[in-house]
Amino acid sequence: MSVDIRPTPPAQDSARQNVTLQIVSVVMFTFIGYLTIGIPLAVLPGYVHDDLGYGSVLAGLVISLQYLATLLARPYAGRVIDGLGPKRAVLYGMAGSAASGLFMLLSVAIQGWPALSLASLLVGRLVLGAAESLVGSAAIGWGIGRVGAPHTAKVISWNGIASYGAIALGAPLGVLLVQWLGLWSMGASIVLLGALGFALAWPKLPAPLVHGERLPFHHVLGRVTPHGMGLALGAIGFGTIATFITLYYASRGWANAVLCLSAFGGCFIGARLLFANSINRLGGFRVAIICLGVESLGLLLLWSAPNPWVGLAGAALTGFGFSLVFPAFGVEAVNLVPASNRGAALGAYSLFVDLSLGITGPLVGFVANLFGFRSMFLFACLASLSGLALAIALHRRSRRPG
């Protein structure tokens, strides 16, 4: 007599919920970390441009410098995650976030000396960028360590929900804090959030270390470079919106630019929740092709927008399209290396979005100086279409035998 011991649907639902809860309990550190990034995001360009009196290129550089610091810190972050464990990396990252808030407080305190104030702000952005390199990848590694490699796409998706959700919440929150309390409140809130994240991470159980051969970082980087390039081209649209949407709206005489960041983040999260399993069903490259096509349409809307509401729709469509670009390319990239090099692979792959966001500020600022603010979104659209072409090429290559 045989007994059917397959899980019933309620048991399967319970197992899925347990996996999701385990993932959320770890990616909340990404949420906290990216909240410290989102709070100053909509305020700093105006602070540098209007209060300190510097130009749009330098205003963009202040935002982009954080991403450049993250890029440079990725190899170190990968070694920390694979060698010391994701928990240790999260603790280091939260401490760095708190330290960056102190530099921001100092910048506001010495605002009367613009050069010194800018220098303190730049140091704080560098520290925050290094902290981001630790927290984001470590949370993914911690989550995969808790629920297993088959759930990699789900962990990456939830980590993205946490990061962009935090930016969508943090941007308007930062504006409100400055309006109600003053510029000092940005730095103070970042210090408090970093301390909170450290306190929450300290008692949690670490994920087990995966033993095995550690590949040199440049070997890992070489394997994931094509996928990272697709991600980088898609990320230019997000970087353009995040850095310049406030100045773009001001140049058109439109109000409520911060709503574009919220619309981008809200649609980003909604798409990830609605289509969380699409990568497992369709494959990473197919999803990347669809998403980059949608993102390109959103950027075209922003470029051609006759009023702020069409611009808002363009930002929302861009967020919807960009939502699954990171996990779509990422799942394909992580599968190229052994599990013992997962942290290095995530760091190497994420490096490309840091590179993209790092150069977007000054590059797009230069484009805006030459051709006007509207031209930024046409430039970003062309970059997104280039990423789509690369995704098609990678998909075709992956289907070739051998």
UniProtKB/Swiss-Prot annotation:
It comes from the Bacteria. It is a multi-pass membrane protein. One of its GO terms (cellular component) is plasma membrane. Its main location: membrane. It holds the Pfam family MFS_1. The keyword Cell membrane applies. One of its GO terms (molecular function) is transmembrane transporter activity. NCBIfam families: PRK05122.1, PRK12382.1. Belongs to the major facilitator superfamily. YhhS family. This is Uncharacterized MFS-type transporter PA14_38730.
